[in-house]
């Protein structure tokens, strides 16, 4: 029996996963409308005429909230597999997860005390 006999499905899946996006991108390039008029190059503003430029400055507080959100969102992504396999992992994994959560709580308290979560 051939050694890689169990991997044909994986190889087929990888080929399909490579071909589908390539075909979709090729089809959209072939079917797109051609023309380079000024009307096509302007931004679409829900049927209204665009007013002003697109370069506006955002308050830095938005970025701070976004960074804090990303940190705790990644925490959820790391804790979800642990929560699914909680009963099989044992006490050591529970202690490691508690240490991980404690580090994130310390980071949250630090951000709170530094004023990163204050809007004023």
Swiss-Prot record:
Gene Ontology, cellular component aspect: NADH dehydrogenase complex; plasma membrane-derived thylakoid membrane
Entry EC number(s): 7.1.1.-
Reactions catalysed according to its record: a plastoquinone + NADH + (n+1) H(+)(in) = a plastoquinol + NAD(+) + n H(+)(out); a plastoquinone + NADPH + (n+1) H(+)(in) = a plastoquinol + NADP(+) + n H(+)(out)
GO molecular function: NADH dehydrogenase (ubiquinone) activity; quinone binding
Subcellular location: Cellular thylakoid membrane
Keywords from the named record: Membrane, NAD, NADP, Plastoquinone, Quinone, Thylakoid, Translocase, Transmembrane, Transmembrane helix, Transport
Disulphide connectivity of cysteines: none
Subunit field text: NDH-1 can be composed of about 15 different subunits; different subcomplexes with different compositions have been identified which probably have different functions.
Role, per record: NDH-1 shuttles electrons from an unknown electron donor, via FMN and iron-sulfur (Fe-S) centers, to quinones in the respiratory and/or the photosynthetic chain. The immediate electron acceptor for the enzyme in this species is believed to be plastoquinone. Couples the redox reaction to proton translocation, and thus conserves the redox energy in a proton gradient. Cyanobacterial NDH-1 also plays a role in inorganic carbon-concentration.
Protein's UniProt name: NAD(P)H-quinone oxidoreductase subunit 3
Native source organism of the sequence: Nostoc sp. (strain PCC 7120 / SAG 25.82 / UTEX 2576)
Higher taxonomy: Bacteria, Bacillati, Cyanobacteriota, Cyanophyceae, Nostocales
Gene: ndhC
């Amino acid at each position: 029996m051939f050694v890689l006999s169990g991997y044909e499905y994986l190889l087929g899946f990888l080929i399909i996963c490579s071909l589908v996006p390539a075909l979709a991108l090729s089809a959209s390039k072939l079917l797109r409308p051609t023309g380079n008029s000024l009307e096509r190059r302007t931004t679409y503003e829900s049927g209204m005429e665009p007013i002003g430029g697109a370069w506006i400055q955002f308050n830095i507080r938005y970025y701070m909230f976004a960074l804090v959100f990303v940190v705790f969102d990644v925490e959820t992504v790391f804790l979800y597999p642990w929560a699914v396999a909680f009963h099989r992992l044992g006490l050591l994994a529970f202690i490691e997860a508690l240490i991980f959560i404690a580090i994130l709580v310390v980071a949250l308290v630090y951000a709170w005390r530094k004023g990163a979560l204050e809007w004023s």
